[in-house]
Each structure stands twice: as structure tokens, then as C-alpha cells.
Amino acid sequence: MKKPYRKISDYTIVGGLSALVMVSIVGCKSNADDKSKEQSHLTQSVQKGAFVILEEQKDKSYKVIEEYPSSKTHIVVRDLNGNERVLSDEEIQKLIKEEEAKIDNGTSKLVQPNSGGSNESSGFGLGSAILGSAAGAILGSYIGNKLFNNPNYQQNAQRTYKSPQAYQRSQNSFSKSTPSASGVGGANRGKSGFFGSSKPTSSPAVSSGTRGFNS
């Protein structure tokens, strides 16, 4: 009676295929880990805080002109006359809640398709400009999948910046910089005269962030 057996070459083939599969899995895992680490680094930078400067436009919309890492999140709004003020936490949360309602009913420009029509030229309101900035990743994090996984948001968020250069500066800043302590001191000084028509803040954080920027 013949005994069942396998040729050595059969095991060699199986072993070779197993090795190829393992190499493929390790390679894919390595690429995924690299992307995960890169995204994690950027997310951690944003989560630590962002100093954002929004500028009012002639159509009463708002654009991000500068933003960079800070140990705490602050949002400065500059009106058409050049006056600046720092938004309070209560005011920011109110704006975000209002924008969240628009996101839920589909009227927020952040989640609408970018058709290039009149809807695009009318610009973004203050709430949508905040959520489109780096600070939106912190302040609007609880909105979650309503916003950040929306493909229209990914495109529209870039349009909340005044120029491609402003957007690129932000990306570079959050990719390789650490939170700046000077941003906190500057923001605290900017809170004086919050509800008044204060002149542009003279804090280093604001002035250094906008130096040489064409407004």
C-alpha cells in the first residue's frame, strides 16, 4: 500500500508564497503606519491650540488670513476698518452651534458642492470660516462625521483662506511647528475692549502673524 506523501517541492512553493504574502502585509502595514504617524503629528499640533486671524471682506464674509499653533485656541476678527477683537468662548460656541444647524439641514456652504456659481462668490460667514480653519478641528470636533468626513467640506475648507499662500503657510506651520507661547500672551492682551471698536492689537502674536500680508 502506498503511503500518502508530498513532494519537497510542494512545500517549497507553499513556503515561498507564504513569504511573499507576509512581505506584502508588512509593506502595506508600514505604509499605513507612516501615514498614520504623519496624520497623528498634524492632529496633535492642532489639538494643542491654534491662533487664527479672520478678516472681514467687502461682501461681509470672512477669510482666514493667518493661523499658527498656539498653546491655547484664540480667534481674532479684523473688520473692514482694521479694528480687531478676540472672540469670547461663548461667542465662538454660539457661532459653531448656528453653523452646526446649517450643516444638519444642508444649508451650510461648508458641505455644499462647489459649483463655482454665485453661491461660491458670496463667501463664508463667521461660523463657517471658523470651522474651515485649523481651529475648527478643535472647536468643532464634537460635530465629527457631520463635517470632517464630508468631501465637500475638504474642498470648501480651503476656500475659507484668503489666498493659496495663506493656506499653504498654515499647512506648513502645523506640520512642523510646535505651539507658540507668545500666542497666548498676545491673545490675552487682545481681549481688552472686546465689545468695543478697538484698534488693531499691538500684540506680537497678531502683528507678527500679519506682517507683510497683503490685505
Curated annotation (Swiss-Prot):
Residues 158-181 have a biased composition (Polar residues). It comes from Helicobacter acinonychis (strain Sheeba). This is UPF0323 lipoprotein Hac_0309. Transmembrane segments: none annotated. A lipid is attached at residue 28 (N-palmitoyl cysteine). A lipid is attached at residue 28 (S-diacylglycerol cysteine). It comes from the Bacteria. InterPro entries: UPF0323. Residues 1-27 form the signal peptide. Keywords: Cell membrane, Lipoprotein, Membrane, Palmitate, Signal. Residues 197-208 have a biased composition (Low complexity). It is found in: Cell membrane. It is a lipid-anchor. GO terms for cellular component: plasma membrane. Residues 158-215 are annotated as: Disordered. Belongs to the UPF0323 family.
